[in-house]
UniProtKB/Swiss-Prot annotation:
It holds the Pfam family CinA. The lineage of its organism: Bacteria, Pseudomonadati, Chlorobiota, Chlorobiia, Chlorobiales. This is CinA-like protein. Transmembrane segments: none annotated. HAMAP family: CinA_B. InterPro entries: CinA (IPR050101), CinA-like_C (IPR036653), CinA_C (IPR008136), CinA_KH (IPR041424), Competence-induced_CinA (IPR008135), MoaB/Mog-like_dom_sf (IPR036425), MoaB/Mog_dom (IPR001453). Belongs to the CinA family. PANTHER family: NICOTINAMIDE-NUCLEOTIDE AMIDOHYDROLASE PNCC, NMN AMIDOHYDROLASE-LIKE PROTEIN YFAY.
Amino acid sequence: MSERVPSIRAEIVSVGDELLKGQRVNTNASFIARSLGSVGIPVVRVTACSDFESEMASVFREALGRADVVLVTGGLGPTRDDRTRKAAGELLGLGLRLDPDALREVERRVTAHGRTMSELMQGQAMVLDGSRAIPNTRGTAAGMIIPAGERFGGSHLVLMPGVPVEMEAMMELTVQPWLRGLSDTTIIHTPVKTTGIGESTLADMLPDIEDSLPEGTSLAYLPHGAGVDLMVSTIARDPLRAERDNAAVVEAIRERAAAFIFAVGTASLEETIIGMLASGGLTLSVAESCTGGLIASRLTDVPGSSVSLMQGFIVYSNSAKEELLGVSRGLIDTHGAVSEEVACAMALGCLRRSGTSIALATTGIAGPGGGSPEKPVGTLCLAIARQVPGSGPSVGVRTLHMHGDRLQNKHRFSEAALRDLWVALRGEQGG
């Protein structure tokens, strides 16, 4: 794969001791990187630094020497440890001025809360000489776009608050449109989402595709608990070429790994399942023991799920399995509550009592107790029953073994159940 150096390079600097101490997660950098990618500007480095002015100035100097645009978050607030303006001003030899539009916005917000304007609050409207103020529609501290001058080869320094909602509004309303005017490239990111396959196994399926990627196209593996997301990224000056090259790689991956791909795009597995149920005119019910309602919860997170998900049973105790689903006591005594026989009975009982097209049932041992040599912690019995026109219900079942603590096992159980449900729905639709 050959790579082309982009015309504009960006760096992100996140200011705050709380980041270095692990007291906050740096979600700002992720948001900014995605925003930059959408306008064809790649991020070449992300740095976190302390609130000390000397440290900030050093980081800003190095970043401006490497990148065309340096985006900084944090240190614009009214407290003593908010020193980003001063550090940037001293580095660039720029003084501060009061921006009248920013001041009016600060005054409006302060008086709206019944407070009196203070010198510290007025400082929120201070911007560096020669900069363009960035309005803060969600807070008080103004941001700024600062030309760094010939000393730094015409690079720009962009200062924004560290409060995520304030920074995000600035990026979307002001910074992103400004950046779009700087970039002469188009970048396309296409997620390809898989389930039921590990990273190394998937990579073994795609070596020739990776070896023949078009110029400017890259393939990233993003593993997670349920599978691996692939990100196909293409950057090119010609928008039509970017779309063509990206689509060709995505299609090649789809043909090679079709059995594991549930979505091309941003849809989650839950969204995909609800969409398949709705498009097929199918209804679903769930009977959960070890997952305790987690499967139903995940499915109902999807808007419009009420069209397809009809009913759920949380049958944690043996008596609940008997009373709500009609599982016989003899079956439980003979095989145990965690068994394929009981899972099948749960799924069939759920199907019968709900009247849905498909029923899903889980019974297992999440831990930390309850395991045995024959049925260790992490054992899951998973059954899916369905109505077969003209021949009555059918049921399929399998046993899986997970390794994790209680919460990890519950999540993995739900992932396995959703994955099997997706596979079953593909069979219903001839996929």
